[in-house]
From Swiss-Prot:
Protein name according to UniProt: S-adenosylmethionine decarboxylase proenzyme
InterPro entries: AdoMetDC_fam_prok, S-AdoMet_deCO2ase_bac, S-AdoMet_deCO2ase_core
Designated gene of the protein: speD
Similarity section: Belongs to the prokaryotic AdoMetDC family. Type 2 subfamily.
Top class in the EC scheme: lyase
GO biological process: spermidine biosynthetic process
Domain of life: Bacteria
EC number assigned by the record: 4.1.1.50
Originating organism: Photorhabdus laumondii subsp. laumondii (strain DSM 15139 / CIP 105565 / TT01) (Photorhabdus luminescens subsp. laumondii)
Length: 264
């Protein structure tokens, strides 16, 4: 897409929102309570603030304000307001390619925000525990928040990721013509590294004419040892391992497809 000469400020709003899910199996109620306490500590407001502050550093944004809160009995939320440093729009990379990792600082944001909310929970009797984090990066200006995606996926390793990217509003060029998007995009997947793409099954649902893009990701690799809390596979019988594996895979597939599957 050729460079646009705008009349005034770039008024497009670009928002990336995604949910990440982490699944585990905890056999007893005490283990499930311990998992909730563990994940609540691992992703408390202070830790989330560090992650989001690092995100701001990566994309070159100035932090204006931080609001954070831990909740009782569990969960946390952090919202950071950020602003853009002075920059030349011709230096901005809006091409469809993966964003930076922590060692590559190349972007800026405008009057924008980054926020995260966490939701740990457990099945009342089935041993399944899940942790969900909702993250949103919203920008006004020339920069796409998709440049923060690659870092966050690496930072928050997950079993399932669902993402939505949307561009709202319009900006006007010097001739008065309205533009409803200022960069080319065919899929959110194009902003991920090949390494990430190789690790996940992915599915797109895009509405191009509405500038709405949706991608789901489900981890390909399944190792039971990675999903057990306070236990190891060696402590389980073959029948128990098969049953727990079935429960975990069913839970992962249900969350990925967004529907409950029949019990077999």
């Amino acid at each position: 897409m050729h460079k646009l000469k705008l009349h005034g400020f770039n008024n497009l709003t670009k928002s990336l929102s995604f949910c990440i899910y982490d699944i585990c199996y905890a056999k007893s109620q005490a283990d499930r309570d311990s998992y909730i306490a563990y994940i609540d500590e691992q992703y408390n407001a202070n830790r989330l603030t560090e992650i989001l502050s690092e995100t701001c550093s990566i994309i070159g944004a100035n932090i204006l304000n931080i609001a954070r809160q831990d909740y009782d009995p569990q969960g946390a939320s952090v919202t950071i307001l950020v602003s853009e440093e002075p920059m030349d729009p011709k230096d901005v990379d809006n091409t469809e390619n993966p964003g930076p990792l922590p060692d590559s600082v190349v972007a800026h944001l405008d009057k924008s925000h980054i926020c995260v909310h966490t939701y740990p929970e457990s099945h009342p009797g089935g041993g399944i525990c899940t942790f969900r984090a909702d993250i949103e990066v919203s920008t006004c200006g020339v920069i796409s928040p998709l440049k923060a995606l690659n870092y966050l996926i690496h930072k928050l390793e997950s079993d399932i990721v669902t993402m939505d990217y949307r561009v709202r509003g319009f900006t006007r060029d010097v001739n008065g013509m309205k533009h409803y998007i200022d960069h080319e995009i065919s899929s959110i997947q194009n902003y991920m590294t090949e390494e990430v793409q190789s690790q996940y099954y992915m599915m797109d649902v895009n509405i191009y004419q509405e500038n709405l893009f949706h991608t789901k990701m489900m981890l390909k690799r399944f190792d039971l040892n990675d999903y057990l809390f306070n236990a190891t596979p060696e402590q389980l019988s073959e029948a128990e391992k098969q049953e727990i594996t079935h429960l975990l895979k069913k839970e992962i597939q249900e969350i990925y497809y967004g529907r409950n599957l029949p019990t077999v």
